[in-house]
Amino acid sequence: MNVNEFVTIYSGGNYAAPIWDEYSSYVLELILNGDFTGGTTNWTLGAGVAYGSNNIAFTSSSSNTSNSTPSLDISKMYLVTFDISNYAAGSIHSNLGGTVSGSEHSSNGSKVDYIYTNSSNNIVYLTSTGFSGTIDNVSVTEVGGSVEGRDCTINNIARLIS
């Protein structure tokens, strides 16, 4: 590794970081077993939701499926991502703490929601309305604040991941 190779991150000022010092190495994943490897440990499946092969399948159900996270903080921004495949009908959205929801999703692909919480309820929900499809790779990470002294506002992170 050549420590003389740097990438510049713009965050109100300039910060030069070694290229091996990537932002992603500082992200704390809050979902336990979001890839459903080997089962649904840490998940509570709602009616019409079943474990597939390292994923969960919804069958035209309108229900909540949930995961208790280590902690969600009031007034924080969170990035929620998940993958939909085998979409057939209905819609699904993420919900943090039972009060704030992301967008309704009704197609295959990787989904991204930024959700600002107003509850300290540590439960992440996937709420479906007649949804038929498969969900995998559920992730929740905190956005904003300072990570290892870096300015990680939503705008700066959006620049980093685009």
Which residue ranges define each predicted feature?
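Polar, enzyme-active/binding microenvironments
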Residues: M1-S162
